[in-house]
């Protein structure tokens, strides 16, 4: 009793109440599933270790000094007498029965725990598989979309290449058609120069028109095919961009799956053909760059050819206009020479009329005719020897003293009137100068036919001015030389004798035609004077008409010169356009080269990153 009292409550307690796993077993209901699995696993491990230890002791047939227990505690039994039979067999059975029950209990507990863990693991595995399958389906869908985009980009690139080849062939056909047009044009021009019949010219012209029509159709087809090639090239570029976007989506999905499912996700899912796809996309982009570069080269060649042909045509037109300009200038010069010759002929006729009138007026008309003849001969000699016409110098004071002030006064009045009406100052001055010259000429003609007194006044001024200039001219070296030349010419040619003989002949002719009285001679002289006046007016009119014709021809020549300058400007403009096309071609190539360089750098960086990751993985 004393021992029981001394032991207290611990001595009377059940062995299971003091078991080391009691607290752990009582806490099973409050633990988390993971801690629950850890506790049961630890208990199972301890149980199996102890069972293996007991089994090894029994197999070694070692006598048990005391009752072996699983918890290493001695078995308590009631005291008995010394002579009483041992109760080893029954105790052994009870011990065996307790160990078996504990083993059974732990086995059932382990089976329950294992079943629960397996169910949870299965559920997690199902969830994992479903998530993995969803990610795999998403990756498969993106991969299929990427492959479709790559195939479409490749097909579009092939179509663009075929369209570019067709456009090139059409360009060659258009070039051949242009050559045929040039040949037909040359045949037609040669036929026109050779003066072939009209039916032959019509057939050649029809062939030329047909060749032009075929060339136009060929250029239309070439332009259409070039536009189609450009359109397909743009479509290929868009599809290549779409394929690049699909590849980026695949890369993003793979990176997201790797971050979500861990580094082992790549081991559980099949490897995506990303590298081959990237390489294929790079090949497609390279082919696309080749097509774009080829298209730029062809475009530059076509523009260069077009500009060259346009320059050649403009140069041909320029040469033609230049020839026409030279012809118009030559025609104007010939017209001026012709009108000058006509004026000289009429002047000599007027001189002859003056000589004819001398037969009926006596010495005065003859002297006047001789003076006119001397002045005409002297003017021609002076023009031939010195290149200067003294008659022009004699008429210069008339222009400066009479005609020029009159023209300036009329021009000033007309200019002021136009400015008062609101016309621009510069345009008014130009119109006033033109109208002033016209009005002055009209006024002189009207005065010549109507106002005899005014004509006499003007004539007196003209005679005074001419007399003064003639005096100065005779006093100068040119005048003295002219007098000497006239004297020598008179001596050598017998002009004096010719004059006397002419006077005698005129007297005889006057007697032969029956002009004896002075009045009859004056009447004929007046008639001859009227005829000379009419011829002089006709000469002036013909000279004015010739001047107008020459002015028209010169205006045509100036128009041709303007066309020549315009053609030269067009040629310069074509050169500038060709230079701009070359600059645009260089810029396109630079952008494409920069794009491919960036792609190459990105691929190189990706390869370097892969090598670094592989090297680190091997090191681990």
Curated annotation (Swiss-Prot):
Region (Disordered): 58-95
Localization of this protein: Secreted; Host membrane
Basic and acidic residues bias spans: 66-84
Cellular component annotations (GO), alphabetically ordered: extracellular region; host cell membrane; membrane
Coiled-coil segments on the chain, per record: 309-339
Keywords, in A-Z order: Coiled coil, Host membrane, Membrane, Secreted, Transmembrane, Transmembrane helix, Virulence
Statement: the UniProt record of this protein carries the keyword Repeat: no
Keyword Transmembrane annotated: yes
Cross-referenced Pfam families: SseC (PF04888), T3SSipB (PF16535)
Signal peptide as annotated in the record: none
Transmembrane segments: 355-375, 401-421, 430-450
Functional description taken from the UniProt entry: Plays a role in the bacterium-induced formation of multinucleated giant cell (MNGC), which is formed after host cell fusion, as well as in the intercellular spreading of bacteria and in the induction of apoptosis in macrophages. May act in concert with other effector proteins to induce fusion of host cell membranes.
Family named by the database record: Belongs to the SctE/SipB/YopB family.
Protein name: Translocator protein BipB
Organism: Burkholderia pseudomallei (strain 1106a)
């Amino acid at each position: 009793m004393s021992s029981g009292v001394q032991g207290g409550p611990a001595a009377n307690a059940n062995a299971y109440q003091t078991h080391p796993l009691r607290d752990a077993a009582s806490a099973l209901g409050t633990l988390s599933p993971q801690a629950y699995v850890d506790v049961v696993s630890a208990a199972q491990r301890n149980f199996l270790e102890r069972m293996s230890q007991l089994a090894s002791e029994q197999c070694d047939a070692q006598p048990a000094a005391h009752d072996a227990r699983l918890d290493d505690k001695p078995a308590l039994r009631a005291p008995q007498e010394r002579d009483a039979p041992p109760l080893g067999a029954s105790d052994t059975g009870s011990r065996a029965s307790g160990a078996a029950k504990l083993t059974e209990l732990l086995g059932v507990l382990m089976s329950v725990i294992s079943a629960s863990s397996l169910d949870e693991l299965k559920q997690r595995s199902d969830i994992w598989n479903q998530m993995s399958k969803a990610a795999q389906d998403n990756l498969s869908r993106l991969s299929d979309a990427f492959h479709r985009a790559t195939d479409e980009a490749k097909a579009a690139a092939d179509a663009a290449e075929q369209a570019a080849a067709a456009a090139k062939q059409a360009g060659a056909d258009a070039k051949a058609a242009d050559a045929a047009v040039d040949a037909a044009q040359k045949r037609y021009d040669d036929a026109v120069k050779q003066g072939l019949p009209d039916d032959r010219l019509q057939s050649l012209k029809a062939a030329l028109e047909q060749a032009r029509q075929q060339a136009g159709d060929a250029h239309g087809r070439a332009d259409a095919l070039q536009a189609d090639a450009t359109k397909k090239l743009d479509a290929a570029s868009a599809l290549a961009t779409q394929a690049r976007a699909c590849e980026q989506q695949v890369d993003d999905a793979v990176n997201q799956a790797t971050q979500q499912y861990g580094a082992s996700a790549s081991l559980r899912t099949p490897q995506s053909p990303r590298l081959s796809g990237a390489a294929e996309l790079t090949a497609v982009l390279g082919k696309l760059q080749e097509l774009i570069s080829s298209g730029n080269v062809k475009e530059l060649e076509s523009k260069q050819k077009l500009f060259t042909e346009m320059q050649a045509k403009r140069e041909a037109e320029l040469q033609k206009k230049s020839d026409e300009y030279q012809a118009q200038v030559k025609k104007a010069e010939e017209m001026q020479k012709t009108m000058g010759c006509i004026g000289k002929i009429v002047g000599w006729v007027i001189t002859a009329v003056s000589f004819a009138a001398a037969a009926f007026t006596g010495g005065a008309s003859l002297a006047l005719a001789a003076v006119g003849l001397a002045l005409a001969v002297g003017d021609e000699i002076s023009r031939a020897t010195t290149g200067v016409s003294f008659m022009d110098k004699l008429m210069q004071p008339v222009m400066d003293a009479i005609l020029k002030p009159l023209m300036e006064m009329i021009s000033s009045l007309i200019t002021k009137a136009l400015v008062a009406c609101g016309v621009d100052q510069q345009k008014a001055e130009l119109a006033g100068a033109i109208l002033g010259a016209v009005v002055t000429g009209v006024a002189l003609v009207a005065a010549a036919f109507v106002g005899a007194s005014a004509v006499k006044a003007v004539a007196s001024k003209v005679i005074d001015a001419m007399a003064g200039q003639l005096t100065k001219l005779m006093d100068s070296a040119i005048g003295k030389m002219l007098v000497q030349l006239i004297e020598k010419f008179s001596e050598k040619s017998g002009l004096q004798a010719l004059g006397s003989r002419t006077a005698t002949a005129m007297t005889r002719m006057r007697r032969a035609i029956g002009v004896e009285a002075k009045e009859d001679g004056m009447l004929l002289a007046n008639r001859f004077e009227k005829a000379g006046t009419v011829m002089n007016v006709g000469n002036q009119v013909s000279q004015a008409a010739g001047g107008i014709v020459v002015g028209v021809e010169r205006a045509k020549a100036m128009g041709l010169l303007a066309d020549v300058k315009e053609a030269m400007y067009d040629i310069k403009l074509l050169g500038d356009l060709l230079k701009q096309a070359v600059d645009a071609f260089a810029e396109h190539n630079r952008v494409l080269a920069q794009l491919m360089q960036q792609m190459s750098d990105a691929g190189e960086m990706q390869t370097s990153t892969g090598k670094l990751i592989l090297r680190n993985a091997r090191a681990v």
